[in-house]
Amino acid sequence: MNNKINNIKITQVHSAIGRKYDQRLILVGLGLNKINKSVILANTNSIKGMVNKVKHLLKIENM
């Protein structure tokens, strides 16, 4: 059985200015605070849920 957890690369491509407060908090929770900043995170259900809420602000790539 393969125990390797897949990672995803998330890049913020749009500003959080004018967005709802909870969307800004989700970006901070993902480690994003500036446009064009990227983070590599484990592809878990909790991360997928957060990404789904702000997918219009992000670019997502599988690693």
From Swiss-Prot:
Coiled-coil regions listed in the entry: none
Cellular component GO terms, alphabetical: cytosolic large ribosomal subunit
Xref: InterPro entries: Ribo_uL30_ferredoxin-like_sf (IPR036919), Ribosomal_uL30_bac-type (IPR005996), Ribosomal_uL30_ferredoxin-like (IPR016082)
Record's keyword terms, sorted: Ribonucleoprotein, Ribosomal protein
Biological process (GO), any one: translation
Any one GO molecular function term: structural constituent of ribosome
Assembly and interaction partners: Part of the 50S ribosomal subunit.
PANTHER family (UniProt xref): LARGE RIBOSOMAL SUBUNIT PROTEIN UL30M, MITOCHONDRIAL RIBOSOMAL PROTEIN L30
Family, as annotated: Belongs to the universal ribosomal protein uL30 family.
Name of the protein in its database record: Large ribosomal subunit protein uL30
UniProt source species: Rickettsia africae (strain ESF-5)
